[in-house]
Design a protein with these regions (language model features):
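RNA-binding accessory domains that recognize and position tRNA/RNA substrates
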Residues: 2-3
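Thiotemplate assembly-line natural product biosynthesis machinery
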Residues: 18-25
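Catalytic cores of DNA base-excision repair glycosylases
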Residues: 6, 12, 25-224
Length: 225
């Protein structure tokens, strides 16, 4: 791998320093959610599907009830859509509800109730895109798999000064940086760290630069001074 990705892109060394500072911050500031207390790939998959366009605190209210009633793939595969809809109702976005039963049935029929361990297989499942697949692989299986959402794109743009395409989540340069970021001994921790950092520090609108451990080398901060 080349040390430099592109003229306006960070070096591998820069990305590693960035990662180590975020993980150090995470060690003292991590958020606690029930789906982070398990490495059960089924629970991680369903939690990540619930978290799409939904705040974590809303998902927290539903998570325990959902897995009390449907603790595994087989139970959710056999669930009636109307009953699933009742449990998931507080999340809103009712159009997502059918995907939960569908994904459980697909896993049962195609993978004998075992959640796939590759991005290629995961992304063939109902309701599973690149982000959810990467989250499952890194968080449940601790694989060196990348995740990119709009928050991570924002952080990369601000800190590194990366120029991206309009659809930043699919930008090949952003994905390349995310791949290097996740290439670490504990990708689960690294990816959870960047998610919390973008939720608590490098937030939309006005970031909390005063509390940011990255501010000294941040392209955004330097441009404001």
């Amino acid at each position: 791998m080349k040390n430099k990705l592109r003229e306006d892109m960070p070096s591998v060394k820069d990305i590693r320093i960035f990662r180590s500072r975020i993980i150090r911050w995470f060690n003292k500031n991590s958020r606690n959610y029930p789906w982070r207390e398990t490495c059960d790939p089924f629970k991680v998959l369903i939690a990540e599907m619930m978290l799409r366009r939904t705040k974590a605190d809303q998902v927290k209210q539903v998570y325990e009830r959902l897995f009390t009633e449907y603790p595994d793939v087989e139970a959710m595969a056999n669930a009636e859509d109307k009953k699933l809809e009742q449990v998931l109702y507080p999340l809103g976005l009712r159009w997502r509800t059918p995907a939960f039963g569908s994904v459980a049935r697909e896993v049962r029929e195609r993978y004998q109730c075992k959640i796939p361990e590759t991005r290629e297989e995961l992304t063939t499942l109902s309701g599973v895109g690149e982000y959810v697949a990467g989250a499952v692989l890194s968080i449940a299986y601790n694989k060196k798999e990348w995740i990119v959402d709009s928050n991570i794109v924002r952080l990369f743009r601000r800190y590194f000064g990366i120029k991206t395409s309009k659809e930043g989540r699919r930008d090949k340069h952003v994905i390349e940086v995310a791949k290097i970021y996740a290439s670490v001994r504990n990708p689960r921790k690294a990816n959870l760290a960047i998610l919390d950092f973008t939720a608590l520090i490098c937030i939309p609108g006005k970031p909390d630069c005063e509390k940011c451990p990255l501010r000294r080398n941040c392209h955004y901060v330097c441009s404001q001074s």
